[in-house]
Amino acid sequence: MSRRSKYLKRILWGLLLTPIVLVLLVSLLLYVPPVQNFVVHRLASYLSEQTGMQITLDRIHLAFPLDLSVEGLDVVRAPGDTLLSVGELSLSPSLRPLLDKQIEVPHITLDRFALNYTDSTGLSTVRARLPKASVEELYVDLEKERVDLSRLVTRGGSVSYTSTDTTKKEDDSEPLRWLIRTGEVDLQSTRIDVAMPLDSLFIGADVTRLRLDRGEADLEKMRFQIARARIEGRELSYAVDRTPPRTPYFDPSHIHLRDIYLEGESIDSEGMRLSLLLSRAQFNERSGLKLHHLSGRYEMDSLGMCLDDFLDTDGSSMQGALTMPWSVLRSDPKAGIELTMKASLGTRDLLLLSYSALDDLPEGKKLLTAITRRQLLAPIRLSLETHGTLSALELSEADLHWPDVVRLSLKGHLTSLLDEHRRSGRLRLTGQVGAKAQTLLSLVSPELARDYMIPSPMTLSGEVDIRRGVYKGDLKAVEGSGRVALKGHF
């Protein structure tokens, strides 16, 4: 081979290898700290020009092969208005999967994260603060749109959302098709606040710990599944305005729960469909109402709901099952209903829950005080079993027992419940009046108590016949050797 051919061959090889060498050289230079600092400042300046915001980045450190850490990232929209701040972000993605459009990161740590976002209308704001978070074994497949996450842990932090916007958003964008799977999510010491004054909604939560095991989110179907969830919280509040509660009793417009514990399993939600097994729930309400235990299975979809649960408070307990379609709420006469319930309702709990209604009555407060003073606080026991439809309902059992006051039992059937002109049926009634019935009458209606005396003990029996909206009663009252027949209609 001639000298000229060798010379041309060297030039050709040089031309071919030069881009590769340059790429390798630039790659190697990126591991040199002075070069990294130069790139950081150039990148921050470029992004600031493109976004119109001031972006500063203190330091980027890249170690072989891809150990990356970012420190001191700040995105400022205007002086004193910081949109985003990151104290430190560290991650080490694997190199080989990147060539296949996949991201594998064994470990990610995030320190001192802050977000302060206001939408373009200035009516909605989101503020978030996260002192520390870590992610383990993150896998992202960009082509299949799938995310797998072994573990996510956060410590401390707060999230607040405020909105005075009532316009309905129309979203014509394509739905997200990402599938996200998580092994364990552990959020510790988190504060959540939501304020929507124009919607009369104010929510605050101080969550000690929220743990989710084996979760899956299909964003295309909007289906969310969680194998197990546990929530521990110091407090949870709901209100319709910012004013303090008017009464020390239970106020449904100002609910404040403390010492909260919730545990559920097999949670599955998609649209109107929801099913879950509530293993345990307990809390204390500001009014003094204490829920010691609540458990059961809940299922609902677009057609109806099914509940099977047990409840226990300081003075009450309840166990039962309910199955009904949503069409019952639309007065569908063919809607089937099944209900069984056994309950012991503490009078104190009933007073706490009904205080707001009694407080509006002229003698409401006096009645509450008198019931307590006259020792009428024995639990009221209820037993109910019914099935059928709104056009034909069978009442298998309906018992009420208020010790020393009254005991009543009803059985029978009803038809055309929704039409007062066609409503018909027959109910059999038995009961007994106790020694404190007269005391209760004197509290509810002192005028009647002065004119009438309720004998005790007195038994009741008879029937109520309903035909086309006309009620006819045929009852007998017996006290010792005395008998009274009561007949009437309306």
Task: Please state what every model-predicted region is.
Residues 190, 276-281, 303-310, 393-400, ...:
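Transmembrane beta-strand segments that form the barrel wall of outer-membrane beta-barrel proteins
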Residues 294-298, 412-416, 487-490:
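Feature captures outer-membrane beta-barrel proteins of Gram-negative bacteria and organelles
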Residues 123-128, 167-176, 200, 205, ...:
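Beta-propeller and related beta-repeat scaffolds in trafficking/envelope systems
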Residues 155, 312, 344-346, 399-401, ...:
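Outer-membrane beta-barrel pore domains and translocons
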Residues 1-52:
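N-terminal type II signal-anchor transmembrane helix
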Residues 58, 81, 125, 264-266, ...:
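Outer-membrane beta-barrel proteins
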Residues 59-164, 173-201, 206-208, 213-272, ...:
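Flexible beta-edge/linker motif
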Residues 81, 284-290, 313-319, 402-408, ...:
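Solvent-exposed loop/turn segments connecting transmembrane beta-strands
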